[in-house]
Amino acid sequence: MVNIPKTRRTYCKGKTCKKHTPHKVTQYKKGKDSIFAQGKRRYDRKQSGYGGQTKPVFHKKAKTTKKVVLRLECTVCKYKMQVSLKRCKHFELGGEKKTKGAALTF
C-alpha cells in the first residue's frame, strides 16, 4: 500500500517562484473523451448501419495495475505539474500514518 500526504514541499518551476514551495497533491484522473476527435468520428461512421462490429475489440489485457500519477499544484503561483509513481495495487492519498506494531487493514 502506498500512502502519500496531501501536501508536499517541492521545487516549483513557475515563472514567479523558481524555489521550493508547498504543493497541493491530488491524483490525476483521465478526462472525458471528446466525441469530435477524428478517430471517434471515423469509428462512429464505420459502425453505423448494418454489419455489426467493424473493428477488433481488444481482449489480451496484460497489465493488472496502472501507474499512479500525482498532480502537484503550487499554493503560491498555482503552477501545476505531474509526477508519476511506480505501479501499485493499493494507493491512498492523505491516509493515517503507519504506527509500529499495528496490523494491516484494507
Curated annotation (Swiss-Prot):
Ribonucleoprotein among keywords: yes
Alphabetical keyword list: Ribonucleoprotein, Ribosomal protein
Any Pfam family matching the protein: Ribosomal_L44
A GO term for molecular function: structural constituent of ribosome
Annotated stretches, region: Disordered: 36-56
GO cellular component assignments: ribonucleoprotein complex; ribosome
Alphabetical GO biological process terms: translation
PROSITE patterns with a match to the protein in the record: RIBOSOMAL_L44E
Family under the similarity heading: Belongs to the eukaryotic ribosomal protein eL42 family.
Protein name in UniProt: Large ribosomal subunit protein eL42
Natural source organism: Coprinopsis cinerea (Inky cap fungus)
Gene for this chain: RPL44
